[in-house]
């Protein structure tokens, strides 16, 4: 049985839709990717055009497949940089792993010619104390990251370790436990853009 959060949401952006001369990249995630997507697009403006799909829906929920269909509709993507893991904590870790397998299957079916890069989930810290990891929630983030790494390694999909960058400096945090300051988003965008640029080269 799917147990959703009290409020679920999703967002779609397609930047520079008029550009046909550059490869198109799709970023998939939650509000974390929404925080750095425009910055990544700015950094890649001479190399690629960027779209992003962010959602609160957890893998395993059938709704995410309907959202994926819309995110991929109308464009051929050269690269998909994707994540899911900070929402849906009513979902057990075994169910998360099973749902992630189906999520990857769907992405590969929708973009069979694209390069795929998994981006792991970022840390959850104590609200107002960004130097402290949340003792209840962050261990689950780490376990989901471990499960995802095992899945991606078996499927020969590269893993982008954004967790290690996000956790490296409390100044990157906005202080709310989840999201990032301007400095943090700039740092995450620098890294993600570099990973994508290298993969497209």
Enumerate the predicted regions with their spans.
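Serine-esterase "nucleophile elbow" of acetyl-processing enzymes
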Residues: 1-76
């Amino acid at each position: 049985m799917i147990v959703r959060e009290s409020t679920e949401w999703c967002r779609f952006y397609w930047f520079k839709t008029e550009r046909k001369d550059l490869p198109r990249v799709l970023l998939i995630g939650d509000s974390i990717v929404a925080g750095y997507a425009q910055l990544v697009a700015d950094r890649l403006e001479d190399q690629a055009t960027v779209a992003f799909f962010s959602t609160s829906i957890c893998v395993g929920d059938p709704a995410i497949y309907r959202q994926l269909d819309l995110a991929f509709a109308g464009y051929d993507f050269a690269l998909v940089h994707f994540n899911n893991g900070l929402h849906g904590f009513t979902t057990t870790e075994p169910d998360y792993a099973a749902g992630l397998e189906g999520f990857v299957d769907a992405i590969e079916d929708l973009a069979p010619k694209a390069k795929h890069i998994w981006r792991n989930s970022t840390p959850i810290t104590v609200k107002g104390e960004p130097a402290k990891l949340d003792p209840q929630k962050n261990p689950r983030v780490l376990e989901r990251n471990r499960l995802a790494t095992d899945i991606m390694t078996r499927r020969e999909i590269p893993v982008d370790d954004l967790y290690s960058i996000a956790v490296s400096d409390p100044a990157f945090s906005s202080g709310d436990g989840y999201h990032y300051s301007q400095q943090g988003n700039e740092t995450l965008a620098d890294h993600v853009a570099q990973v994508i640029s290298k993969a497209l080269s």
